[in-house]
From Swiss-Prot:
A GO biological process held by the record: cell division
InterPro entries, sorted: CedA-like_sf, Cell_div_activator_CedA
Name by which UniProt lists this protein: Cell division activator CedA
Species assigned in the record: Salmonella newport (strain SL254)
Alphabetical keyword list: Cell cycle, Cell division, DNA-binding
Gene name of this polypeptide: cedA
Length: 80
């Protein structure tokens, strides 16, 4: 007899999309860019959308992070 794939009594955890927090305490703000912070040696953009911050993936170049932030801003302007 084959075993069932799932444990029968284990509850199914429903997925809740993660809301990124504001930039953490140890992030260093870059003065030359509007939304870019340095985090663990990488460049990360934080954009406030509505009530919450959206965080970009880590980029190795600050310009890329800022481009991402600009794109997110544009998308949200269209959505509003």
């Amino acid at each position: 007899m084959m075993k069932p794939l799932r444990q029968q009594n284990r509850q199914i955890i429903s997925y809740i999309p993660r809301v990124e927090p504001a930039p953490p305490e140890h992030a260093i703000k870059m003065d030359t860019f509007r939304d870019v912070w340095i985090l663990r040696g990488k460049y990360v953009a934080f954009v406030l959308t509505g009530e919450s911050f959206q965080r970009s993936p880590a980029f190795s170049v600050p310009e890329s992070a800022q481009r991402w932030a600009n794109q997110v801003r544009q998308e949200n302007e269209i959505a509003d």
